[in-house]
């Protein structure tokens, strides 16, 4: 390769490492900002609120539904967001970097999925889940670094779906809890038959950072 080629590869390696290692912080402190996530067994809004309102450790929350769906040859998630989601889920236009609204009769689409589908703001996209086919206008292409997502609000779902909306996820804000207190809270939540699991966002950040540290060895080599 020669000296110039080797130097170019070294610079490329450092650049890749720096760009990838920013992803956990960008996703979990900029795009989504919950402290923990509860996973429900497809409950009504009233059932979800009963669980959440009865726990004093939860300072605030937002309820949503994440559903597997297909668009073209790609597997995606449809995320239907209920009230108060703006506290935890933040949408930034890929081009302008400005915050986006999740308007009625529109969807927001994550940037990697938009690139794969070659769609942009203002286009109409068709996708389907187990119960419905959707033809929706793209309100904006937004930043997202994990999985492929299409986001819509509750009113848009109810207008376009033949099935009543249930909820399988909640983002929650916690007070200052120690690790032991978090584990106790998790065990308490899992005693409820409507709760399938509870995870903490800091654990996800730590796991992602641990995996990314392996890049240091690659860069050194």
Predicted regions and their residues:
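Peri-transmembrane interface segments
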Residues: 20-24, 186-221
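C-terminal structured "cap/appendage" subdomains that terminate the fold
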Residues: 125-134, 140-143, 154-155, 173-176, ...
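Small-residue transmembrane helix packing/gating motifs
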Residues: 31-32, 101, 141-183, 202
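Short beta-strand boundary microenvironments
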Residues: 26-30, 34, 45-46, 50, ...
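N-terminal Sec/SRP start-transfer signal
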Residues: 1-7
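Short, conserved charged micro-motifs
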Residues: 44-50, 177-187
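Alpha-helical transmembrane segments
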Residues: 7-33
């Amino acid at each position: 390769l020669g000296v110039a080629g080797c130097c170019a590869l070294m610079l490329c390696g450092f650049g890749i490492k720096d760009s990838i290692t920013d992803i956990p912080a960008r996703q979990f402190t900029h795009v989504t900002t919950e402290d923990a996530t509860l996973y429900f067994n497809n409950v009504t809004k009233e059932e979800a609120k009963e669980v959440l309102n009865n726990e004093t450790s939860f300072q605030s929350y937002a309820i949503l539904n994440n559903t597997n769906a297909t668009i073209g040859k790609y597997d995606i998630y449809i995320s239907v967001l209920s009230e108060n989601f703006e506290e935890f889920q933040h949408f930034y236009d890929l081009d302008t970097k400005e915050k986006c609204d999740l308007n009625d009769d529109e969807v927001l689409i994550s940037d990697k999925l938009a690139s794969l589908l070659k769609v942009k703001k203002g286009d109409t996209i068709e996708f389907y889940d187990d119960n419905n086919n959707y033809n929706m206008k793209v309100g904006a292409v937004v930043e997202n670094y994990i999985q492929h997502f299409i986001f819509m609000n509750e009113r848009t779902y109810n207008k376009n779906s033949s099935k009543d909306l249930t909820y399988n996820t909640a983002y929650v804000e916690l007070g200052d809890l120690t690790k032991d207190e978090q584990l106790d809270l998790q065990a308490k939540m899992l005693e409820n038959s409507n709760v399938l699991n509870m995870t903490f966002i800091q654990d996800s950040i730590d796991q992602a950072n641990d995996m990314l540290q392996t890049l240091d060895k690659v860069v050194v080599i």
